[in-house]
């Protein structure tokens, strides 16, 4: 009982120290008008990572200097986006909400931020059978380019809330309509994560290690790129 009390006291004290350490950072964020944020350790000493709905920031412990954008680890044979690697936890947390087209003989998994009003997103989806045949599993998340209150967002909400999400997505991409629907899926979560990962247009492809590949690539070129990328980053 005594040991349990001591452990609780130590944890409470540590939590208090952490909040005190972040006080300068929180003050700076408040001054910048950033209300919703998650402060985490950074891969560089003397800094913290701040996750916001507008992207990822790196801020010094004293709150005086801020860097916006991805951070790269260049110690290996190829640069690694450590910012997006950190965000993989949030990405995987949305796995149950993804619309997945699984390859029969899976070799690679890509997550695609898509928009039903995007021409190249349609082109990518039309070639889904080819991606799958090459061993590429495609997982979709929604990224309405016109914003969260747009018609596209509402239609994508209906797709993601449909009983058969894959059929609903196929139908809409083929020019058909989908019945309005509501559920617990929040497209804003998809969109916010996309922004944090650096998505600014669609389609945007996120690899299994967090690397962001903007734009459309045909199936064969995508397969070649994924194979080469896997070789370069193996062991990272």
Curated annotation (Swiss-Prot):
InterPro entries: DiS-bond_Isoase_DsbC/G, DiS-bond_isomerase_DsbC/G_N, DiS-bond_isomerase_DsbC/G_N_sf, Thiol:disulfide_interchange, Thioredoxin-like_fold, Thioredoxin-like_sf, Thioredoxin_CS, Thioredoxin_domain. The keyword Iron does not apply. GO terms for molecular function: protein disulfide isomerase activity; protein homodimerization activity; protein-disulfide reductase activity. PROSITE patterns: THIOREDOXIN_1 (PS00194), THIOREDOXIN_2 (PS51352). Residues 1-20 form the signal peptide. Changing residue 118 to T/A: Loss of activity. Belongs to the thioredoxin family. DsbC subfamily. This is Thiol:disulfide interchange protein DsbC. It comes from Escherichia coli (strain K12).
